[in-house]
């Protein structure tokens, strides 16, 4: 560690947010497993938080135990004790540095909704902000913004379902 630091003050809490209500729920659980396996637990206090398909937020205790044992399943289970995001994130932020890593796919995850919640809670997160996330989910709106800024793009035809 630089300057003789023991690294204790360099630790931050990393909330892995995964699962979700979209059709891509299972893909998100697999993504979370791979991120959890790759994160250096010497530098982060990792809190896996799952959202089930009904929208309930839970502390994924089984993932924490499996990670500690070095025996992660192929996909993380998003269930466990209830985890109310706003008060819990406020508590974590008051205790020290915290960042949320949203691993949610599809609507209600990467469309700006979770990013908006985190910004309202004043909690830093990994990834694009509210506007860019919502634009990325609406491909036609994104192309219209690109056109307004004279950015080149492939020809396209917009279809509305």
Which residues does each predicted region cover?
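ATP-binding N-terminal substructure of ATP-dependent carboxylate-amine bond-forming enzymes
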Residues: 1-131, 135-144, 148, 160-161
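A charged, well-structured terminal subsegment
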Residues: 153, 158-161
